[in-house]
UniProtKB/Swiss-Prot annotation:
The keyword Amino-acid biosynthesis does not apply. Its EC number is 2.7.7.7. Keywords: DNA replication, DNA-binding, DNA-directed DNA polymerase, Nucleotidyltransferase, Transferase, Viral DNA replication. It comes from the Viruses. Gene3D superfamilies: DNA polymerase family B, C-terminal domain, Helix hairpin bin, Palm domain of DNA polymerase, Ribonuclease H-like superfamily/Ribonuclease H. It is an enzyme of class 2 (transferase). One of its GO terms (molecular function) is DNA-directed DNA polymerase activity. This is DNA polymerase 120R. GO terms for biological process: base-excision repair, gap-filling; DNA replication proofreading; nucleotide-excision repair, DNA gap filling; viral DNA genome replication. Belongs to the DNA polymerase type-B family.
Length: 1141
């Protein structure tokens, strides 16, 4: 008897959803497939069919929709015009604006509702494209006339609508009833338990009972694949390129294990060409005879093991794009890309571009395979941690104390060449060394994935933001906020209108207020902070889209009124006023020193002035909402309040679990640790989401822009922090040392107080001031007294913390100073730290005075510098590198009408025709060099590295040192070199100690000025050593022997009609004559200057690179002709350059 192909499941089936796929291939119906794990960690695929997606069509208010025949007419028109669209007349609130009306019965104000048609369809294409496009044209409806409609809600994809309507977690436990598909031939997926839920089938009851949120809390254990590639480069000194024949993917390491798995559960595989040995590699070896078979073997292994998560390090920028490009080059992409749970369906290549404050600029590729969740660990680490560099070796050493073998790219390429040469033990050894290194990369990534709780962090953030986990990588912040807001609006019957507010040109919000500090070294400073300032302001003053009262008929007593003036860069701006005052004094004073000081001060003001001038009066009103009367509570305040409450509950639960953990052992302890880790990631997700909620309102071109909210929140933030500062000074006789955004640093009259008394006083002050603000605004004492507080300028300070019992912590906190900046060398940080330590650790009355101690420390460090007592690593500088567009400029005209150019993300001067003529720039190479000179020095170094054929480090941070040249006037771009290059040539190159000392002048002299009122101490030290260096260079120049080396030219020329090359050489005149003899059909492809050590460069070149040569690189020679022999022209040019430089 044949087995049934399906089985009806009447009881709820539970599964943990982690991946969502919207299938829009069908024109008539959109399908949603959800992939997850059941309670036994088996793979599950749930196909949700019959879900009617929806949009809202706004109806004009000038028609009386209380008349049923008007409603019937418009509904009938839509049903007849679009038969596949379901239409319902609804009255909803609008998101934008406080739309109120007075009740006729009691005169109270109530929310006004507006007429909409809710249009639903099985086809998302119909609702997203067909219907909105048609409705752009006014529709003539019998009895109603010509009506122009507006469509809202099409920004919400079917997945967002489904999860919002039925309150489903995007990463969490879901329960459903439906049909289980048993027949493998009928199944859509492979290696999954497969179910179908048809929401349109009335026999199952209401759709909300067919699929809904589950109350299970079991922690799933997805199968994780961590992988890494090793790729050859046939050029040896250049980065691999997928379209080059010899740039072969020759090894792929794969680590499989369940989340939370132990070491002995790990499955290790190395897919490799050649013949590596398992003993050295420490993994099961899967050997392949060709690269194509290896690539397909990777696909087969993925499909066999069926991992839920595929992770690696920098895989979005290298590994996955390279595999995709390589399989395209090998003409196997479609077959290779069939790596998802869906049978015989290739993954879709996705190219992503977006940016945010956390992730910065993101540009990457990945393969969108159903059911596979791709997670790149590099952007996760970059977002959450500040490190000097983000190389895997650095990150793994920092977090898990493990490292990997040192194997640079050149050695990897050699392992490939030697390892694939033959089947000898030597070849096997080379391939094994590389395989071991490759396996180490994958294992470190897996351990980091576990250590950093990446799964918990992403899943909890996905749930809070109502987006799938992959969206956290592929989309920016706006979609996260929009998804939360959409879900709330759907439940509250509020329409999130598209283009509901048009941002005016003069609407820009001013940032937080920063008080001008009183620089100095203070004792026992109290830090007082607003807790979650912007979310609290949003709640306290009910600042929201739906509460902004533009309607003048709404009385002021119902509203919070916010009125202020914005003066930025205009005549009323205090900075501009001060600049004008300084200008007048400069024109009248005759004292040169005073004039110089004022010019410097004026220059600083000019730099700080905003280019965007604002001179505006603002007034906004927002409906009040109280605990007793919450009728008018806004959407954003409600969402934020819910998140803050949920965070509070989560943290309380963490506290209870930590208490239990103190006495737990064995499996119970492990379970509690896991629960605490999950809850910690959850409370962080609530915190991050609550703090970023208001940001979407201030993005002019965003999904839901509303500048009045952003402007009013920042205004109230400035107002409240200023009010606290006033209260601290007037009511509590405190001295305001500094204030910034949400914090005040105040010094009370503490000489007669013990530390515990001062502590208690700070708590009382914070509580009393909090009572003067509406809840939930709360001023908090940070539970730390800064026993010493060194304030330098705005946003730059250092402090040492004391506890209630007077215990002083050794660590020195810092903000905005040299110690916080990763682009400063270790030497600068050391000398700065030594100075700071000497100030903070000095005890008055013990030994010498503070000034003598500090100056001795600084002087000793400077002497040690020029005595070579610091290691080389202390002079390494790291800076992040950006895309510079391969030196291909995109010209534009800026707001001032000045021609500029963009080189990738760098804004540089434009090469105008006038400059081109003046500087005689004729060739493309000269143009590129001109633009290169306009880029930052470390970006110029990046291009220098590329031209050398070396590979820049992963993670976008470049390490370099500054070396001496023969001139003190040379630009930094001339002196800058990579650390490996310097190390290799340190017998010739010397570090430029003067440069490093010069970098210390401002930060060190700033502290000395603030603490001791001492001017230019380090600067004078620098000037003395600079003078000495200048004399040394002049003496060296005076006694330097002069060598006259005559150089000849060598030119590579090519026939225009044929790919035939020749060499012409000799003096410049000789080359011109030879080229003239060849005729007009020959053109110059490359020029070199060389010392003529050989009589006939052509014969030397032919003997070395001809058919009988021993080298791998060969060209065809016939007479004086040279042919490429299937190699690129660039190969011939680089070979000539190397031989005759």
């Amino acid at each position: 008897m044949d087995k049934p192909s399906t089985k009806i499941v009447n009881d709820y089936t539970h599964f943990y959803a982690y991946s969502w796929h919207v299938d829009e291939e069908s024109v008539d119906e959109t399908f949603i497939r959800v992939y997850g794990l059941d309670e036994a960690n088996e793979n599950v695929c749930v196909s949700v069919n019959g879900f009617r997606q929806f949009v809202w069509v706004e109806l004009p208010s000038f028609i009386d929709w209380s008349l049923s025949h008007n409603v019937d007419r418009v509904v009938r028109y839509f049903e007849q015009t679009w038969p596949n669209v379901g239409v319902q007349f609804k009255m909803y609130r609008k998101l934008y604006g406080a739309n109120l009306k007075q009740s006729r019965s009691n005169g109270e104000y109530v929310h006004k509702k507006f007429p909409f048609l809710q249009c639903s369809s099985m086809s998302w294409k119909m609702l997203k494209f067909t219907l909105p496009t048609a409705l752009k044209t006014p529709q003539r409806i019998m009895g109603l006339g010509s009506i122009k409609f507006r469509v809202h809600g099409q920004d919400a994809c079917p997945r967002l609508q489904l999860t919002s309507k039925y309150n489903l977690p995007t990463a969490g436990w879901i329960q459903f009833k439906g049909i289980e598909i048993l027949d493998q031939d009928v199944k859509f997926s492979q290696s999954c338990r497969e179910f179908m839920v048809d929401l349109s089938d009335k026999n199952w009851g209401k759709p909300s009972t067919m699929i809904c949120r589950s109350d299970k809390t079991t922690v799933p254990r997805p199968l994780i694949l961590s992988f890494d590639l090793e790729v050859n480069s046939e050029e040896v000194v250049t980065m691999p390129k997928a379209t080059k024949p010899g740039d072969v993917v020759f090894q792929i390491s794969c680590i499989f294990n369940r989340l939370g798995g132990v070491e002995n559960e790990v499955e290790r595989y190395l897919l490799s060409l050649g013949n590596p040995t398992e003993q050295i590699v420490g993994a099961t070896i899967l050997r392949y005879s060709t690269e194509k078979k290896l690539l397909m073997g990777f696909r087969d292994l993925v499909n066999e093991k069926n991992p839920n998560v595929i992770t690696g390090y920098n895989i979005f920028n290298f590994d996955i794009p390279y595999l995709m490009d390589r399989t395209v080059y090998k003409s196997i992409f479609v077959e290779w890309a069939q790596q998802g749970f869906a049978k015989n369906r290739p993954g879709i290549p996705r190219e992503i571009r977006w940016s945010s404050s956390a992730y910065k600029n993101q540009e990457f590729k990945y393969l969108d395979c159903e059911g596979r969740l791709y997670i790149d660990l590099l952007p996760v680490v970059q977002r959450d941690f500040k490190l000097n560099d983000y190389k895997l070796k650095t990150v793994s050493t920092f977090f898990i104390g493990e490292t990997k073998d040192d194997l640079d790219p050149t050695s990897i390429f050699r392992c490939y060449r030697e390892g694939t040469r033959d089947d000898s033990p030597k070849a096997s050894h080379f391939m094994s060394i590389c395989g071991k290194y490759c396996m180490q990369d994958s294992m470190l990534v897996y351990k980091l994935f576990e250590k950093l709780n990446v799964w918990y962090g992403l899943s909890e953030m996905a749930v809070v933001c109502n987006v799938p986990m992959i969206t956290l990588f592929t989309k920016g912040q706006q979609i996260k906020v929009y998804s939360q807001l959409y879900k709330y609006c759907l439940a509250a019957k509020i329409i999130p209108e598209k283009d509901g507010y048009i941002v005016a040109e003069n609407e820009r919000y001013v940032g937080a207020h920063v008080f001008t500090p009183k620089p100095g070294l203070y004792e026992n400073v109290i830090p007082l902070d607003f807790s979650s300032l912007y979310p609290s302001l949003m709640i306290a003053y009910n600042i929201d889209y739906s509460t902004c009262a533009f309607d003048a008929s709404i009385p002021d007593q119902l509203c919070h009124i916010m009125e202020w003036e914005d003066h930025i860069g205009c005549a009323h701006d205090p900075k501009v006023v001060e600049k004008e005052r300084l200008t007048q004094l400069i024109n009248t004073l005759k004292n040169k020193e005073e004039v110089s000081r004022m010019r410097k001060e004026r220059s600083e003001i000019t730099k700080s002035l905003s280019k965007n001038v604002m001179c505006e009066k603002r007034k906004y009103r927002f409906l009040k909402s109280t605990t007793e009367d919450g009728r008018f509570k806004g959407v954003l305040p409600t969402i934020v309040q819910n998140m803050l409450d949920a965070r509070k509950e989560t943290r309380a639960e963490m506290g209870r679990l930590k208490k239990r953990l103190g006495t737990a052992v064995g499996e119970e302890a492990t379970h509690l640790q896991t629960q605490i880790a999950i809850l910690n990631q959850r409370q962080l997700a609530y915190k991050v989401s609550a703090n970023s909620m208001y940001g979407i309102t201030g993005v002019k071109a965003g999904m839901l822009p509303f500048m009045p909210v952003a402007m009013s929140i920042t205004f109230m933030g400035r107002t409240n922090i200023a009010r606290v500062a006033q209260l601290l000074q007037t009511q509590y006789q405190g001295e305001l040392v500094y204030g910034d955004t949400d914090s005040n640093y105040v010094s009370f009259n503490h000489k007669n107080m013990s530390m515990s008394e001062l502590w208690d006083y700070a708590i009382r002050v914070a509580d009393e001031i909090s009572q003067q603000f509406p809840p939930p605004i709360k001023l908090e004492f940070e539970e730390a007294i800064y026993s010493k507080f060194l304030i330098l300028t705005k946003k730059r300070y250092l402090y040492q913390t004391a506890l209630r019992d007077g215990t002083i912590k050794k660590e020195i906190g810092k903000r905005g100073v040299v110690l916080n900046r990763r682009d400063n060398s270790g030497f600068i940080r050391k000398i700065y730290q030594n100075m700071v330590d000497s100030i903070f650790n000095h005890v008055a009355g013990e030994g010498r005075d503070l000034k003598s101690v500090v100056l001795d420390v600084v002087t000793a460090d400077i002497c040690a510098l020029f005595n070579h007592q610091f290691p080389v690593d202390d002079f390494v500088i790291t800076k992040s590198t950006g895309n510079y567009g391969d030196l291909q400029p995109e010209n534009f005209v800026n707001e001032k009408g000045v021609p500029r150019a963009m080189l990738g993300q760098y804004n540089v001067p434009c090469l105008t025709s006038q400059v081109r003529e003046e500087e005689r720039i004729e060739t493309e190479e000269q143009e590129q060099n001109w633009y290169l000179d306009k880029l930052p020095a470390h970006i110029q170094l990046l291009e220098k590295i590329r031209r050398r054929g070396q590979m820049k480090n992963e993670g976008g941070r470049l390490e370099y040192v500054i070396v001496e040249t023969n001139s003190l006037k040379d630009k930094q771009s001339t002196k800058i070199e990579t650390l490996p290059y310097y190390t290799k040539n340190r017998g010739i190159l010397k570090l430029d100690y003067l440069y490093y000392l010069h970098r210390c002048i401002n930060p060190l002299d700033q502290i000395l000025k603030v603490v001791f009122d001492l001017d230019d101490f380090v600067k004078r030290q620098y000037k003395a050593r600079e003078a000495k260096k200048k004399v040394t260079l002049e003496l060296g120049e005076l006694f330097r022997p002069n060598f006259i080396i005559e150089k000849s030219q060598l030119q590579l020329v090519r026939a225009r009609a044929d790919e035939v090359y020749r060499l012409v050489y000799g003096t410049a005149a000789d080359c011109r004559a030879q080229l003239g003899e060849l005729g007009p059909d020959w053109c110059v492809r490359a020029k070199f200057e060389y010392v003529p050590l050989v009589d006939d460069p052509y014969r030397y070149f032919q003997q070395k690179y001809g058919a009988t040569g021993s080298l791998k690189t060969k060209f065809d020679f016939e007479g004086r002709d040279i042919r490429l022999n299937n190699q690129p022209e660039s190969k011939l040019v680089s070979t000539l350059k190397r031989e005759f430089k």
